[in-house]
């Protein structure tokens, strides 16, 4: 009982801290907070938290201590144990305001899927098989392949100082390995050059700062056909060779690299539920797949993605970092689970969910191995790291990026029927806080999105004033794009794209105008409501 009480006290402290960071605005406050971008000491970069001594696993309880601070953030972690400052970690241009100006991976923006030597990816196969709800394919998307010059100017006009995008492996290296596609190389080089030349909006020489993700769910179909993609250890060599090309060709101007975007989504959605390509699953976890084993394959896909990440990181450190002065890390999907009740069982279920979703990827990068509960529950179904592999992956990141999308209520499921339950034995109910508005008129006059951004920034400032080492964040997203599950019917961008018009014109929404004024310090933010600890506890334990 004492252990349960201690856990409950710790959890309540975590919930309070998360509250300050994430929701900022659902109850009452003693005084309103007014601030502008100058109140953010590191600017509005997508929140980077720098901690010394990443390799000294005994000095920090990671990811557990950090999870309470950083849902929805990027963290900068120094893997070599030195007391690296924020500026050292990210270069002289770090202290600037930043917005994420692109969707999660290039296919949703670029389009031109069959042009200039690009070969199919697994997402092309998926959409062309009629799997999208609106029967769209994304072949055109937001036409970024042809309209990127216009979009870079729009970024500059808006006041953006950083741009985050991923590279299409199938466009750069059409067969997945071997010869580079000259047209693909030309496209990415010109995009990067155009971003860098927009230096007049920045107080340093780097123009619009570039953050590149090497891989985000868009695997070359050629390699998928050859050896089942992430299920095979052969991916490690091919991914490292692909990363080598990117570091060599673009590293003179790119200082921030993410290896694999959301490897836990890759594993769960691609190989457990099978709702995204390569659509592998088995009942009862997924029922619409032609092949797969949901009890084994997600673990192997994640395992190989961790090893591929570490291999690429070590390559960058050994071959490029000294000259290029960049940083490299990974990025994971994150939601925050709340216990449905005060019971010890539900509180323990929260930790299991964290271990099986976040710790699954982060524990190997810190400790060199999976969480103990995962190894116990999954047994022989989860691969083991050799001693050499453990040394390779431990500390293999300059930063860890965390994408936060939603929060969940969690209850214990360990005493219920096992059919249909995951290894962590917890039932979850999702509580979304998105800001997509689907009617065109409402989308353009998106007051709810403005309120959301204002509240989120207010929560960030509150966390800063309460001691959290928060440095900024990217806003999602710059343009309406082809979305993973909703196709062209989920306008989450700050700028509207008219997908009914063949020319795909862009039009700033109210949120784009508001954010641009905020970036230029023409307006501030007034936070009139904060959630008190008592009200927060009542909200989640009523």
Curated annotation (Swiss-Prot):
Annotated disulfide bonds: 281-289
InterPro entries given in the database record: Glyco_hydro_1, Glycoside_hydrolase_SF
Residues noted as binding a beta-D-glucoside in the record, renumbered to the chain: 88, 216, 405, 476, 492
EC number: 3.2.1.21
Active-site residue numbers: 262 (proton donor)
Pfam name, any one: Glyco_hydro_1
Keyword annotations: Disulfide bond, Glycoprotein, Glycosidase, Hydrolase, Signal
Annotated glycan sites: 34, 135, 445
Group of enzyme by EC: hydrolase
Catalytic reaction(s) noted: Hydrolysis of terminal, non-reducing beta-D-glucosyl residues with release of beta-D-glucose
GO biological process: carbohydrate metabolic process
Region forming the signal peptide: 1-29
Molecular function terms, GO-annotated: beta-D-fucosidase activity; beta-galactosidase activity; beta-glucosidase activity
Record-stated family: Belongs to the glycosyl hydrolase 1 family.
Name of the protein: Putative beta-glucosidase 23
Species in which this protein is naturally found: Oryza sativa subsp. japonica (Rice)
